[in-house]
């Protein structure tokens, strides 16, 4: 990022702040010489100090030329940023160097100083146009402390001349005197108690200890080898740079030692200096208040983003440096505070670690900065990329109060550059109408996140990128007003200029018409007004969401209840089994109506449920069992015999005796709950014909024996066997229901047609039925006493001559002979449908018919009630609806 700083164009490119007493920065006044002969460190403004006397005069200077006068005039106008550090350092430069020289093989250096030998060094050409540097690395004894080698009396070799010789002699003499004084002070330190030691030699000890700590601490750590990174150590006392890594030259272009002794904030962009100072002030409070007794780094590591100055040398910009603009590059500064306490300090006491209690304690606090260059994320113009998501947050006033640092490579802005600015200023003016609709949805959703269509967002270089945003918001639950809006962004397309850190071009704003700009201002005000309104609670949407949740819950509960009802039905099964006999199931065709089923595997017709079919079947079987309550055995036998005679004539596909025996046995067994007998009625043993009585009795006895002793063992009944049995029975009962419904309707229509034909034939032949009071009384008597002996025989002549003819004809129509045998000429009809015929023609109450009534309906009733012998047990059965439903059971089984 390049920006113009007009006040820096006159400053030397070395970025050093020139103090008012910087006359010794250039030791040679000759403009022809390229080498620095200064005896003082350029980092500390080059002041020499004489140890023998109290004079602080500078070294002899050459004649001042016109160029030097101009330069000095310019330097006097500039403010000094390190005057305090320079003054404190000048008084200790010689002593520090002398101590270091004596400590590091000082004998050889002293011999050099005494003999006056000049050490030739390979000087380097300075890359500055105003200030020449002591070019070689050998000109500095310790780059970590920023002390020049020239103070020790070692100067680069130059062209012989009287000025150079005088300067060299003065330097060597000063060095020799410094070494002698340091020896004297060291000898006195062994005799003088530690309590009486003055500050005259404590400062050199601190300086030496600081130098050693810096060298040991930062040289032991691996330097930043990552591309675009370098490390800087800044003293927290005066903000002066005391250490840099060699990679600084590759990143910003400055030589390795050019930052030493300079204030770090001078290299920070002017607009970032205030934010940097505030960040350091807030971060340095904790390390100073909670100092580590043993030294070391503090855990508080934080980051700051700012722009650092680039180097303007001859190699990079050529001649005419003052006419070039000062450029800056964006960096991420990872800062750590490090405390270095002198290990040999005699005043260091355990528990007493405050900076005031340690001489020079404040000098031991350093700020370690690792600067990482931030580059643009785009390689070419209009690049389509999938960036990581970054977040911004702005208030209801549209002022940004949080910016994710991840956005810098994509937007080109530093976080503190966007904070406090209106987010509406970054939107494209033509997209503001669409964004107004987006903010309306934000107010309606009441905090629910949603994703909008892409829109354009301005980058630092003036171009626009394409963003896709997922919006959310927070509404104050008490004031019902919007507090802030959060946007999670993702870049879809880069700007036309790939370098987003470049300075914006002013001509880009001219591409948008004035009308669009005016309209955008109006829309911005509307958006601000919209966000300041009270958020309305959308009750309709909430009701819809609530109803949807209720429906989902109801569906879930229904499915859950279906699963729960299955074991509930199974648990009730043992209670129902005690009221029925397994013998009944065997005799009814191995069908057990005792169990209920929870699922009806029906066809598309959706027949009645299995529970309903089972219930109807149980009731029907109860009425068919003809329970004996107050009747005698003889009357029961007569009813069973009459029923057997009817049932045996209409059984198709099976022999009459077998069906009759099965029916009789079933009826007797169904009476067992009423009679209180577990093995059936005792009178049932003598019923039936002689040929089939024995077989029925043997089957009943065998089944009863098996039921009570062998076949039915409750402990052997398992759940798997019960479920399989229930499924089979369910299928069979549903199938019976279908067959009964289909066949029953066909046979009923056939029976009605046959009866209708016989009635028409009777009327055509003029048959007159003779009535008698005895016949009429028989009808009345049959309705009152269903167990009379009149229904014992199927005699067609019992009701009269006319009645007998009709009866025989009807018997032929139904396929039944008068003798009780199956008639071969006509299709057989199950016996239950004979009962069905009686039900259709017999009203549910007693009817007295007059013989002289000539109307066909009366003839129909008279015919039906007089000529067809009615079984005595059928006269009293009113709920005969179940008889018709149960008709196919006798045929299929």
Swiss-Prot record:
Residues 12-50 have a biased composition (Low complexity). The keyword Cell inner membrane does not apply. It is found in: Nucleus. One of its GO terms (biological process) is circadian regulation of gene expression. Phosphorylated with a circadian rhythmicity. Keywords: Biological rhythms, Nucleus, Phosphoprotein, Repeat. Involved in the generation of biological rhythms. The biological cycle depends on the rhythmic formation and nuclear localization of the tim-per complex. Light induces the degradation of tim, which promotes elimination of per. Nuclear activity of the heterodimer coordinatively regulates per and tim transcription negative feedback loop. Behaves as a negative element in circadian transcriptional loop. Does not appear to bind DNA, suggesting indirect transcriptional inhibition. This is Period circadian protein. It comes from Periplaneta americana (American cockroach). The lineage of its organism: Eukaryota, Metazoa, Ecdysozoa, Arthropoda, Hexapoda. The gene is per.
